[in-house]
Swiss-Prot record:
This is Cytoplasmic tRNA 2-thiolation protein 2. It comes from the Eukaryota. The keyword Cytoplasm applies. Signal peptide: none annotated. Disulfide bonds: none annotated. The lineage of its organism: Eukaryota, Metazoa, Ecdysozoa, Arthropoda, Hexapoda.
Length: 403
C-alpha cells in the first residue's frame, strides 16, 4: 500500500503570492546532478526535507501524490464522469495539468475516467473584471482533450456555456451580489458565498451528468478550513470539510480533493516546472483585502499562515488531526437545508445562550417593554431554525437584521 510521508509539509512558500516569471526559492538554475537518477540537469528542485532532484524526478514524485490519494482509498470508480473545477488559481491549474497527464498515459498507467472542465468565474462577485477570454482560450487549447465550460458564480445553472459560446455578463444581473450586500458581517458573506459556490458546482455536475467533482484544495487550505469550520459552529461536520471524499453535495454527487497532500512549495515548483500561467496572480478570496481582522475566515487564514511561517510543521499537524476526526452521524439524521451538514437537534445550552444574547441585543431599549421573556423568545427562534445548522442560522439571522 502506498504511503505519503508526513515530513514534507514544512513549506514557507506562498502559492497565492507568486509573481509571474519569478523562480521559487529552492530551485537551483545552475547545472547539477540529480540525487535520484544521477543524471546531470540544468535545474534542480529541492523541496524541504528532500534532496535536490531533476525536473522529471520531481514531477514523478508530486504526481504520485495525486495518484496515491485517489488510488489508496479507491474513491474514484473506473470510467467515472468527473467535473474538474478551475478558478484560475495556481492550485486549480496544477490539478488540471495532473489530470491531463494521467489521462494521456498508456493503458496501464492511465487514469480511467471521463473528465470535463468548468471555469467558475467569481471575479464579478468581488467587483473585479472577469478573466481575459484570450487566457481562457489558451488554456482550453493546451488541454483540448477536455470539454471547456464556463459559468459565472451567482447566475443560474442554465447560464452554463461552452467557452466558444461564452461572453461576460453584466454585474447588475447577478442576484448573488445583491444578496451579499444584505449581509452585515463579512464573516456571513464569506460563508454564504462558499455555500453558494458548492451548490452551483453540484448543479453544474448534475447538468453535465458527472458523478464526481475534483476540488483543488491543498494542505494549507484544508488546515485553514478545519479551524474555520470549528470557529463558525460547524464542528460536527468539520471532518468532511477536510476529507478526501465529501458526499454532502446534492443528487449524490461526490466531491474529491486529490491535492490534499500537496504543499504550497510543491505547487510553486510544479507551476515553474510545467510553465503554467495562473490567471490569478494574487490571493483573490472575497473580502481578503479588508484585512485579517475583518472576518473569522480572514483571521483564521492569517493565524495559520503565521504559524506556518514560524513553525513549519503546523499545517501538517492541523491537517493530519483533521483527517483523524470522524463524523458522528447516522443515515436517518436530518441535514441542514443550506449546507447539507448533519443537524444536531438537541437543545444546547451554549446555542441557547448565544440566541439569548442575540435577542437581548436586538431588543435594545425596548427590552423593558417586552412582554415575553428573552429566554422564551430565544427557544422559539431556535425551533424555527431547526432545519438549519448553527452556522447557517447565523447567516439567516444576519439576512433579517441587514434587510
Amino acid at each position: 500500500m502506498c504511503s505519503i510521508g508526513e515530513d514534507d509539509f514544512g513549506d514557507e512558500g506562498g502559492t497565492h503570492a507568486m509573481v509571474a516569471g519569478s523562480v521559487p526559492s529552492g530551485i537551483d538554475l545552475s547545472p547539477g546532478e540529480c540525487s535520484k537518477c544521477d543524471i546531470s540537469s540544468d535545474e534542480l528542485f529541492q523541496l524541504n526535507f528532500r534532496t535536490p532532484e531533476c525536473r522529471d524526478c520531481f514531477l514523478a514524485y508530486v504526481r504520485h501524490k495525486f495518484r496515491a490519494a485517489l488510488g489508496a482509498a479507491k474513491v474514484l470508480p473506473r470510467d467515472a464522469e468527473v467535473l474538474l473545477v478551475v478558478d484560475g488559481s495556481a492550485e486549480s491549474l496544477v490539478l488540471l495539468d495532473m489530470l491531463y497527464y494521467a489521462q494521456t498515459q498508456n493503458t496501464f498507467k492511465r487514469l480511467h475516467c471521463s473528465a470535463r472542465m468548468v471555469y467558475l468565474e467569481d471575479q464579478p462577485v468581488q467587483g473585479r473584471d472577469p478573466a481575459d477570454l484570450e487566457s481562457l482560450e489558451a488554456l482550453s487549447k493546451r488541454y483540448e482533450a477536455f470539454e471547456f465550460y464556463v459559468i459565472t458564480l451567482g447566475l443560474p445553472v442554465g447560464s452554463l456555456k461552452l467557452l466558444k459560446d461564452y461572453s461576460p455578463v453584466a454585474q447588475e444581473s447577478n442576484e448573488l451580489i445583491q444578496k451579499l450586500s444584505q449581509l452585515r458581517s463579512l464573516t456571513s458573506r464569506q460563508d454564504y458565498l462558499q455555500q453558494q459556490r458548492k451548490n452551483l458546482i453540484a448543479s453544474v455536475a448534475q447538468k453535465l451528468h458527472c458523478s464526481h467533482v475534483f476540488n483543488s484544495s491543498i494542505s494549507v487550505d484544508l488546515a485553514t478550513q478545519l479551524l474555520t469550520s470549528i470557529a463558525l459552529g460547524r464542528g460536527g461536520s468539520a471532518a468532511l470539510d477536510v476529507a478526501l471524499l465529501d458526499d454532502r453535495l446534492a443528487a449524490g454527487i461526490k466531491l474529491l480533493r486529490p491535492l490534499k497532500d500537496l504543499t504550497e512549495q510543491e505547487v510553486q515548483f510544479y507551476v515553474h516546472a510545467q510553465r503554467l500561467q495562473p490567471l490569478l496572480m494574487a490571493s483573490s478570496r472575497y473580502g481578503q483585502e479588508l484585512g485579517d481582522a475583518a472576518s473569522l475566515q480572514n483571521l483564521t487564514s492569517a493565524f495559520v499562515a503565521n504559524l506556518q511561517k514560524n513553525f513549519s510543521s503546523t499545517v501538517s499537524t492541523v491537517f493530519r488531526t483533521g483527517g483523524k476526526i470522524s463524523e458522528s452521524t447516522h443515515p436517518e439524521q436530518a441535514k441542514c437545508n443550506h449546507c447539507q451538514s448533519a443537524l444536531d437537534v438537541e437543545l444546547s445550552d451554549t446555542l441557547l445562550a448565544i440566541e439569548y444574547s442575540r435577542s437581548v441585543s436586538e431588543a435594545g431599549v425596548r427590552l423593558n417593554e417586552a412582554i415575553e421573556d428573552p429566554e422564551i423568545i430565544s427557544k422559539r427562534r431556535m425551533k424555527l431554525n431547526d432545519e438549519l445548522c448553527h452556522a447557517c442560522s447565523s447567516i439567516e439571522a444576519d439576512f433579517k437584521n441587514g434587510s
